[in-house]
Amino acid sequence: MNSRLIAGIKGLLPISSRSLRGFRVQDDARYAQLFQVINDQRKALDKAQESLDRLEEQCRGLNETLEYIHDSNGVMYWQLFRGDHETTEQAQLRFFRGLPKAEGIHALFQDAEARLFELFDQFCRDHGISYWGTGGTVLGAFRQQDFIPWDDDIDVYIAREQLSRLETAVREDGRFRITVVWDWYVPCKQIRFRSIDEDNPCFVDLFPLDWVSGDPEDAWQVCTQERMQFVQEIRKQYAGSSWSRDVYISGADPLISALELNLHRHLEDLADRVSILPTADGATGLIRGIENIDEVRPSGPYLTGDWTGSTTLPFRGIAVPVPSNYREYLSKAYGDYMALPRDMHSHEHVADEYIASPKSVRAMRRILSDDGERTPGDEERR
């Protein structure tokens, strides 16, 4: 019989048991080698994890040592700096108020920001609209009675119904405008009070608050959870969108209306879990709006008595409303707010390219040179 035919027939027949055992032995050897490699890798990973754990423990120890040295040096410094018949806090205030001021374009920006804040404050008083300073504005008002030298912006809390009144008053007045920008990085909804002059880079940040009844602590926690859910949803929904690419969107961007619907739905969900009130009547506290930028440290809950019975702190001659327990607020927000700051030399001002253009400089000088009521082009027409 043809040998080629015989070979073909053998190829169609089942393999012998001896051949099958041979294949099985080879496979077992391969599996054993693979398992050995996996086991060796696992041991190597375990050893690497042990090394990493030791390094983390050493880093924690170093950090604790550095914290101790920093705190100890701070105590010794204040004792050396303190004058006769001067308390430690008086010495600290003297130190902070004696720090060098901003210079150059940043000084101009701070001056123009302060002027816009003055106009904002007067506008609110004229229309019976209440607000409170917050964040670095409260810290600067207490420590420096001015901007923190390495800070540039004005931060304001405003109850949601007061914000609505402000928006209406601004539309009817014509000298100012309220702008909205959605920020992908945080993400958050930036609401700002600005001059009608679009060349003016200055702004007052407006952070909405909501009145609540019931336990303010519970409401604060629920609001924090809703904020997290809101952020997770829009991060997922708009990943890969023009918003994620452009980072900041505003005006007529088609995504704005969709984002506002997302926000409205989450505010409704929050209202189902927390008793949100339209005004301060019957309120026990305030919670931060879920559209606001996140805090580094939680500063709440805010009790109604501390905020409706507010006091003022001086900020460049402006009597800025702040909660009556502003020291407690600052402690929660910043920890030891009288400690020597670690970012005096590393904290960056607002980007120069944002404020240093000739148009921006002219607009800032314009708002400083008059009562802020002129509109762009007035000086050219004169």
What is each of the regions a protein language model found here?
Residues N63-G133:
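Helical scaffold of the NTase/Pol beta-like nucleotidyltransferase catalytic core
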Residues Q144-L166, G317:
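Catalytic metal-binding acidic patch
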Residues L139, S164, V212-G214:
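Surface-exposed, flexible loop/turn segments at secondary-structure boundaries
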Residues W132, T137-L139, F147-W150, F315, ...:
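Tryptophan-centric aromatic hotspots in well-structured domains and transmembrane helices
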Residues K101-R125, V170-Q225, Q229, Y238-A333, ...:
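Conserved catalytic core of two-metal-ion nucleotidyltransferases
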Residues S130-Y131, D155, T312, A319:
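Beta-sheet entry/capping signal
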